[in-house]
């Protein structure tokens, strides 16, 4: 027979009930929680973080500094030396999507991850060790203003092609 299941929803503090034969409730949008390693841009619509690896194989998370509601930067080794700057622009009225602009000021390996907190879409840009990206101006992101588009996408900054090992994009 069917079984009654429960799932806690941290957004509203409620316990949601459903039958085992029914699909689980859709996940609630994530709230963007700004902390030392996370930027919340476009009024908390986008969660932005970066991880890095240097030439001595040391790893870490970039330390975030918000510059405005649409931009911020990250430092890796010294708070006085920015390593990455990121901007997310609301271009909904002109192109129907959000634009992502960023520039690395370092040649360490890094993975920049931008997540839409409403749709849970995730966009990752990978910069390989030893490569200094000349910047990235992405005006055709997966972040459509109507919430459509793939759930995930990953790009290698050397080619702007999907990163090796990236699965086929799935519609969200």
Name each region found by the language model:
Residues 3-172:
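Polar/charged low-complexity regulatory segments
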């Amino acid at each position: 027979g069917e079984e009654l299941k429960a799932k806690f929803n941290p957004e509203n503090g409620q316990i949601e009930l459903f039958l085992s034969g029914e699909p689980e409730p859709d996940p609630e949008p994530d709230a963007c929680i700004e902390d030392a390693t996370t930027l919340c841009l476009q009024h908390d619509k986008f969660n932005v973080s970066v991880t890095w690896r240097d030439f001595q194989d040391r790893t870490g998370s970039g330390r975030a500094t918000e510059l405005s509601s649409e931009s911020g930067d990250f430092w890796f080794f010294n708070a006085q030396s920015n390593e990455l700057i990121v901007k997310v622009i609301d271009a909904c009225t002109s192109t129907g999507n959000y634009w992502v602009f960023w520039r690395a000021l370092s040649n360490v390996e890094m993975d920049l991850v931008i997540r839409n907190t409403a749709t849970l879409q995730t966009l990752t840009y990978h910069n390989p060790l030893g490569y200094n990206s000349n910047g990235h101006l992405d005006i055709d992101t997966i972040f459509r203003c109507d919430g459509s588009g793939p759930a995930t996408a990953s790009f290698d900054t050397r080619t702007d092609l999907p990163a090796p090992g990236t699965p086929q994009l799935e519609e969200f």
